Design a protein with these regions (language model features):
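Glycine/proline-enriched, intrinsically flexible loops and inter-domain linkers
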Residues: 1-177
Length: 178
């Protein structure tokens, strides 16, 4: 069946392959400009010493007093372009700090489905994971997936469309976020 329950989803991750649509529940904020990395480095507790183009990382944002504000996955798409993906609290904190600080950045939000004024996303996000994920990805791309360290971005083609794939897993099996 197309949809059953959480237990079947978990078993697919462990025994075959699961395909998740993550487009509906997380906002993406694109941060562009010469201060993009500096702004996110200021807001996140993570080190940015090894962060660069075609890399991603789990980012944790705290207030100046150390209280947790939010978290998400941060992608470096180009030297001066980042994308933050996650729940709304981190995006609100990012937007507030960009507005009140002296940062040379522009922000573009692609809100999750129910709050998106356009009624659709500009970018959709999916997770493919499980022991059979490499075979499925090879079938979709026509070639074995290139190997990359965890959280590195790969550029692949599926059905003639450019797709960015992040080597990533939630359950310890092979997986990619597309």
């Amino acid at each position: 069946p197309e949809f059953t329950n959480w237990r079947d989803e978990q078993m697919a991750c462990r025994e075959s392959v699961a395909f998740y649509d993550q487009s509906f529940h997380m906002t993406t904020t694109f941060v562009r400009g010469k201060d993009a990395v500096a702004l996110l480095s200021h807001l996140c507790v993570n080190s940015f010493s090894t962060f660069g183009v075609d890399r991603s990382r789990h980012s944790v944002m705290c207030s100046p007093d150390g209280y947790l504000i939010g978290d998400g996955i941060l992608y470096c798409l180009a030297e001066d372009e980042l994308a933050l993906v996650g729940r709304q609290a981190g995006h609100n904190w990012l937007r507030y700090n960009a507005a009140v600080g002296d940062w040379d950045v522009s922000l573009e939000e692609d809100e999750f489905m129910s709050d998106n004024p356009n009624g659709r996303r500009s970018m959709y996000r999916f997770q493919v994971e499980g022991p059979h994920a490499p075979a499925l990805m090879e079938q979709l791309t026509g070639a074995p997936m290139p190997t990359a360290p965890k959280l590195h971005l790969l550029h692949i083609t599926i059905a003639g469309h450019h797709v960015t794939a992040m080597q990533h897993t939630m359950a310890g099996n092979p997986g990619w976020e597309l």
